[in-house]
Amino acid sequence: MPDISLKVLSNEIKISIQELIKELSIIGITKTEDNYINVLEKNILLKHLESKKKYSLDTLVLQRKTRSTLRISTVGGKNKSVQVEVRKKRAYVKNNKFENESFLNEKKVIKHSMQKTSSLKNKEKKYIKNIEKIELNKSDSRSLNTKKENKLKISNKDEQNKKFNQHRESNSFDLNHKKRIKENKDIRISHKEEKQDYHLTTFLHARQAEDENDREVEIDKRNHGRILKNYRQKKNNKNFHNGRYNKEEIRTFNRNKKNSKQKNKPILLQQVFQKPESIINRDVIISNTITVSDLANKMAIKSSEVIKNMMNMGIIGTINHVLDQDTAQLIAEEMGHKVIVHRENALEELIMKDRDTGNDVSAIRAPVVTIMGHVDHGKTSLLDYIRSTKTAFYEAGGITQNIGAYHVKTDLGSITFLDTPGHSAFTAMRSRGVQITDIVILVVAADDGVMPQTIEAIQHAKEANVPVIVAINKIDKTDSDIDKVRNDLMKYNILSEEWGGENIFVSVSAKTGKGINKLLNVILLQAEMLELKAVTTGMAEGIVVESFLDKGRGPIATVLVKKGQLKKGDVILCGFEYGRIKSLRDASGNEVFSAGPSIPVEVLGLSKVPFSGDVVTVVRDEKKAREVASYRKEKSREKKLSNQNRINLENMFDDINKNNVSELKIILKSDVQGSLEAISGALLKLSTEEVKIKIIGLGIGGITETDASLALASNAIILGFNVRADTSAKKIINSEHLDLRYYSVIYDLLDEVKAAMTGLLSPEYKENIIGLAEVRNTFKSPKFGLIAGCMVTEGVIKRSNPIHILRNNIVIYEGELESLRRFKEDVNEIRNGLECGIGIKNYNDIRVGDIIEVFEVREMKRIL
């Protein structure tokens, strides 16, 4: 067939050329008015137009949504509700011709079915008449048997013949019944098919069609069941017809009742709950703790039943009573259920087992050496000389305030150094440094000797069972005394090998470099004796030495690898945090792709800043790592809440006394995690019985607008350690005149907080006696009552000051003067050796010989 132009095709299908071009563009064929179309493109276009006509204006599409909730049990044993939505879509087409044809066909089918049902009813009537005749014959035979015994055999034969006929008729009834059921089914099927066609053609009867189908199904089921039941009763029971007639009479009697209309209505099927005949045994998942109500829900019984069972076992509780795992298991098993004990840390154990630990072949690793000692004894300077750097020169105040990890490669071998702070506030930091180290270098200044932090470092080393090498520093000074240092260390069981001990002593100078090579040789010799080895392949494990928040890069942790290979892109789990490693940098700031055992690296990619000392573990799945981290965080929170003091009589009185205690509220921000822990611990130790330090907020990084708003709401001071406030925070601080202080040395911070606490102390009041007067005589005054005539024996008697009245050196009254006169004139003060008259306010029991003591109260400032 030749190609057709678009104009001819538009005339054929009666569509304008513009619409035709649009339809062609929809199916991906681009044409213009002057173009031609081939046969294949024409067929595709016609199919497209037919499908478009399928849902025309005479078609109505209905959508129905049904929503329901489904409760399922999760892995943790808790019930979880899931929303289920079922969507149905139906299209109803309106076609008058098809509707009329289907309506006529339906009428024919109904007439045909009515004729068949009338013929069936006539057959049933004939069958009933035959049965009545048989029953009458049976009664006649019984009467003949009583009168004539000789005709018994004949009557038996007649009965057998009748039974045979009856059996034959029953068989014919069975066949007729089966035919009738088939015919009804055929009628019903044809009727349904016609009705389906009918209902598809019209929208007005759409819902009625569904209801009619349901009703007919129910009626057919009941009729079918009734016919089968009647046939079985007829077959097995001789009195079937009498019972049937009685039932029909009962049925006709019931029809005359008031509610007969409701009873004759067809009843649709309804879902009815049926109580189980026996107890259903369920699988009950029990966690570490569970309440009685939750346990009852999991066993699908009432809470009262669980409480009854508990009382039988000797446990008294309510629905909110919390049961431990063992008790809940006993209760559930007692009630016949199977218990599945759920371990909350099962996911953590699973994720730790699913790790590639390498080939378990150990190799020699570099020793981890921690440098410890007192403040300003030259620890960082010694390390700077070894590394050829000037770290101590740039440190604030010339003191180290966080742990620094460095890997040094020398001609003799590789060594990893950890530089710890020497200040007393950094005790926890030093203890953490000892726990991850192999060798401790105890630096003691030759001119200063053994100091408190030196003793503390010795104790930490002994607790960790780590060998100690003593480096006596500053030997280049003129006032250095090496023998004195040896004697002082001997008191703490640190003996040199020369004196028969186990510790190696090396005299060094961090300034000139004297003895440094010998110290490195001793370290490597000690490491060789310890035979330090680690697995160098597989997933890595390490420990966080220090962590901080970088403004540009985010949370950063300094990690010391213990075993395995830490690589870029690994998923790590670190305490309460997790993440994928984005970058690895060594101590010099150079980016590396992997790090082996005893190598410290800076890790970038964690969700938040971890705590120093947290264990870093490489895992496979980031999603599971997030779940374990959130589980750890939740358990830590629950532990904190459980450790809070419960209300009892003792702490109730403590809370009452707290009203007399002043609080200094502090918001603390630091640059690194270790310094934050050290400062917060030192501040809390400053608390006294009268002034308490309350840290309401602490964190790593700069001071933000949130910190300033919190300080404004809680009336707190803001302390920044090596951090600064941003622009938005400065606006709030300046406008609200908040107290913001910056520090770079921990000494200054602690001293100023002590001064602030001193200002919060309540002042002391001291009584200072300024004068004594002896009562010589008493007389009455109409205005002031009893007046004491006195002689001033010491000091000065002032009118405005308070007084004590002493009798036999015992204070019997404390009050104030009401009048002070000399020669009937009011005066303000009377000096020593003069007489005066004194009137005491609200006191008339003054006697001769009493001593009036005049004093003044002075306010004294207190010091912590």
From Swiss-Prot:
It is found in: Cytoplasm. Residues 419-422 are annotated as: G3. Residues 140-179 are annotated as: Disordered. Residues 509-511 are annotated as: G5. Keywords: Cytoplasm, GTP-binding, Initiation factor, Nucleotide-binding, Protein biosynthesis. Residues 473-476 are annotated as: G4. GO terms for cellular component: cytosol. GO terms for molecular function: GTP binding; GTPase activity; guanosine tetraphosphate binding; translation initiation factor activity. Residues 140-171 have a biased composition (Basic and acidic residues). Residues 398-402 are annotated as: G2. Residues 364-533 form the tr-type G domain. GTP binds at residues 373-380, 419-423, 473-476. Residues 373-380 are annotated as: G1. One of the essential components for the initiation of protein synthesis. Protects formylmethionyl-tRNA from spontaneous hydrolysis and promotes its binding to the 30S ribosomal subunits. Also involved in the hydrolysis of GTP during the formation of the 70S ribosomal complex. Belongs to the TRAFAC class translation factor GTPase superfamily. Classic translation factor GTPase family. IF-2 subfamily. NCBIfam families: IF-2, small_GTP. HAMAP family: IF_2_B. This is Translation initiation factor IF-2. The gene is infB.
